[in-house]
C-alpha cells in the first residue's frame, strides 16, 4: 500500500492598498480571517490563510497594500512586510482594481519583476466596470507589461470567477508535505484575531473620523471558571481629541464598537465572550519602533 501524494504551496496575495486582497482571501477560505474596510491599508500584518482539501493545501499570504509614500515608520514596516512576502512564495496573485492603473500598481509590478514565482493577475471589481468594452483593451495592455501566467477577471465581493482562480492555483501546486493540520484556517492566535476584529469595528463605525494612527492591544485574554473568554482591549490613539472621538458622546460610540466586536468574536471563537474596551493616548506610537515592536508590527 502506497502513501497518497500530497501537494502544498505558499501563495502571496499582493497589490496596492484597497484593491480587495483581504476580501479575496476571505472568499477563498469561505470564512473571515482578514479584516476588511473601505479605508486604505486596513491590513497591517502578514496573515496566513490556510485551505486544505484532501491532498491539497493552499497557504495564502495576505499582505499589507504596497504604496509609494512611506512617511511614517508603520508605513515603512508594512511595505517591508508586503515586499518580503513576494520572495518567499511559490506563486503570486497580483490584485488590481478594474480598469484603474496607478503609480502604486506600477510600483508593485516592478517589485514582481525580481520574483521567480509565477504571477497570476486578478482583475478585481469587474462588476463595477460600467463600460465593459474597456476591459478587453485594458487586459491586452496589461498582458504586454509582464509575462503573467494567467489573467483572470474576478469579483471577490460577489465570488465571480474566484473558483476559477483557485482551481488554477490548486492545479499549479507542487508535490510536498502539508505544513499545517487540515483543520487550521490561519496561523494567527485568537488574541491577534480579537485585536483585528476590534480594529475593523473602529473603521466601520467611525469611517472618515477614524485617525489612521489607531491600533489595538489585547492586554488580557483568559478563560474564566465558567468557560467564558475574558478579553480586555486597549485602543491606542495619538491625541486627546482622537480619544474623545472613539469614546463618543456619553460613551455611545465605544459601546457600539464593543457590542459588535464581541458578537463577531463569539461567532469566530464559538465561545461566550466578555469584552472590555479602554482608550489611551500614546503620542507618536506609529513612529516609535519600540512601540511597534511591542505591538507586534516588527518580527523578532
From Swiss-Prot:
Domain KH type-2 span(s) in chain numbering: 206-283
Region (G2) location: 41-45
Keywords from the UniProt entry: Cell inner membrane, Cell membrane, Cytoplasm, GTP-binding, Membrane, Nucleotide-binding, Ribosome biogenesis, RNA-binding, rRNA-binding
Keyword Ligase in record: no
Cellular-component GO terms for this entry: cytosol; plasma membrane
Highest taxon in the source lineage: Bacteria
Organism the protein comes from: Glaesserella parasuis serovar 5 (strain SH0165) (Haemophilus parasuis)
Region (G4): 124-127
PANTHER family attached to this UniProt entry: GTPASE ERA (PTHR42698), GTPASE ERA, MITOCHONDRIAL (PTHR42698:SF1)
PROSITE patterns in UniProt: G_ERA (PS51713), KH_TYPE_2 (PS50823)
Cross-referenced Gene3D superfamilies: 3.30.300.20, P-loop containing nucleotide triphosphate hydrolases
Domain Era-type G stretches: 7-175
Protein name per its UniProtKB record: GTPase Era
One Pfam family hit: KH_2
Subunit structure: Monomer.
Region (G5), start-end ranges: 154-156
Chain's gene name: era
Subcellular location: Cytoplasm; Cell inner membrane
Role of this protein: An essential GTPase that binds both GDP and GTP, with rapid nucleotide exchange. Plays a role in 16S rRNA processing and 30S ribosomal subunit biogenesis and possibly also in cell cycle regulation and energy metabolism.
Similarity-based family: Belongs to the TRAFAC class TrmE-Era-EngA-EngB-Septin-like GTPase superfamily. Era GTPase family.
